[in-house]
Curated annotation (Swiss-Prot):
Protein name: Uncharacterized protein L803
Record organism: Acanthamoeba polyphaga mimivirus
InterPro entries: HD/PDEase_dom
Gene3D superfamilies: 1.20.58.1910, HD-domain/PDEase-like (1.10.472.50)
Source species taxonomy: Viruses, Varidnaviria, Bamfordvirae, Nucleocytoviricota, Megaviricetes
SUPFAM superfamilies hit by this protein: HD-domain/PDEase-like (SSF109604)
Length: 243
């Protein structure tokens, strides 16, 4: 079984790389997909769930952005994720890996997990079972901390978003930073409000998504990583050099 999992993982990575070869966007490339998947794999070591559910989590983590409208504006109903899964399982026998559900049920379960990832759509929505939030929380780990700071900067440069405006909060302490990142701002973001600057994006979204109350997986690996990465972002906005 372990050999099959490794072969499947390698085939998945190859298939995704081929699919995304002409579609990489700053912060949303295959390296990001793999980083999110690797967080999910580490988190799954703490979960007592079936192999089929573990595979669904891993696939959802790897495929969570392949239908992102920032990359594929015409994608409908997770068509790219479904296509990649179908491609993979024409090359490898599903029945040799999973025996407790049909392929259609397995695939739909992955789509459901992917649908939970988007912050603007499903920000802090609850899940039926905590493990179902692992792909979302694993993705959030890559949006916060030092890697998240770099990704945010790269994406701001990519879409030509200003670093700050006159109206952007200027926190001097951790307490001020957290007070500016209030629930109203996060609710507006989840309801479609777009951040007006890069630093505003920290207060609208990034300083929220790594807090324990928004990490529905309640997974020990994810909670430990998020705690450190949250502080790195707070330090960043406090020490940001406004001209």
């Amino acid at each position: 079984m372990e050999t099959n999992f490794i072969d499947l993982r390698n085939l998945t990575e190859l298939t995704v790389r081929e699919f995304m070869s002409n579609h990489n966007v700053a912060g949303h490339d295959v390296d990001h997909f793999i980083a999110v998947r690797n967080h999910a794999i580490k988190a799954l070591k703490y979960e007592n769930i079936s192999n089929s559910k573990k595979l669904q989590v891993e696939f959802a983590a790897m495929l969570h952005d392949v239908d992102d409208p920032k990359i594929f504006s015409q994608s409908i109903d997770y068509q790219n994720a479904k296509y990649i899964l179908d491609t993979i399982f024409t090359k490898m026998s599903f029945e040799n890996i999973i025996s407790d559900c049909t392929y259609d049920v397995f695939k739909q379960g992955i789509v459901t997990l992917i649908s939970l990832v988007s912050c603007s759509k499903n920000g802090d929505d609850g899940v039926e079972e905590s493990w179902m939030a692992i792909p979302r929380d694993a993705d959030r780990l890559e949006a916060i901390g030092k890697i998240g700071i770099q990704r945010c900067t790269d994406y701001a440069n990519h879409i030509k978003l200003p670093y700050y405006l006159d109206s952007t909060p200027r926190a001097k302490t951790s307490e001020e930073a957290l007070s500016f990142a209030n629930r109203d701002r996060f609710d507006r973001y989840k309801n479609g409000h777009k951040s007006v600057s890069m630093i505003d994006h920290y207060y609208d979204k990034l300083l929220h998504i790594g807090r324990p109350e928004y990490l529905c997986s309640n997974n020990p690996y994810i909670l430990e990583k998020s705690n450190k990465r949250n502080q790195e972002m707070i330090d960043y906005v406090i020490n940001f050099k406004f001209e």
